[in-house]
Amino acid sequence: MLSIVDNRTFKRLTYRVLDHDPTHVDITAFFRRFHAALTARGLTVKGITTDGSALYPGPIAAVFGEIPHQLCTFHVIREVTKAVLSAVAQERKRLAATSPKLPRGRPGTKVARRAVRRKEAIKRKVGELFDHRYLFVRRRLSPSQRATLRRITRGRPQLRRLRELMEEVYRLFDRRCRMGTALAKLATLRARLRRSCRLRSVLKKLMSPGLEKALVFLDERLMGATSNAVERGNRRYRKMQDAVYRVRTKRAIEDRLALDLLRESQAQGRASTTKALHKARAA
């Protein structure tokens, strides 16, 4: 299902339901139909936000020309957070592998008792890293959460560097800075990653050449940073398809989308009517 949604009002503007995976031809035809509808009304597209799919750049340039094209920041941050959590999991495995193997029976010697204490300490450390793993990727941490993070990363500087890098990634997408400032921060971050083989292999997404497109919204104040408006509407239909068998066909989805567009066009009139009825009833 292809959809174009106004990122300011979160209203669906046009749609097309396909019975196959979309191709460049489908995307181009979809954009041309939308462009023709805008031209007939004297409107133009000033910018567009999409996910990171390779299907969009070619058709956008062919139909709309040179317009600002923003990649959804949510998808970029999601890939980075997944990589950071994976790195934390690898560190847990490395830490668990250092746990000493104990012989059977009660520890009778001082060395054996020391090994038991070390094994329990490592097990406790691994458990804490698992229980509090999301502290490494949260956007904002409270003072108590920061204290917990310092405690569980004590003696593990590589884990603290992961959290520092995550904070730098969030600062890249701060609306208070301009795109030029963000690009300078990104260049500094990439240089730092090149000096660390382990971090470079973990955060490959930050080295991708198309990441700059995720920072376009910093200079375009009216442009949405994410494509959540489209995904929220599509998610509603995916959820509906799980429960209502009739909505799974192409024809049923088209009819349901058309009905939703009709309801949205009449929403303001319904609100005015409801307000007038409440006012008359209260009089």
What are these regions (language model features)?
Residues 32, 88-92, 108, 262-265:
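Short alpha-helix boundary/capping motifs
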Residues 51-54, 59-104:
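Conserved beta-strand -> loop -> alpha-helix junction used to position metal-binding or nucleic-acid-contacting
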Residues 21-22, 90, 244-246:
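A short hydrophobic/aromatic micro-motif that marks alpha-helical segments and, especially, helix-coil
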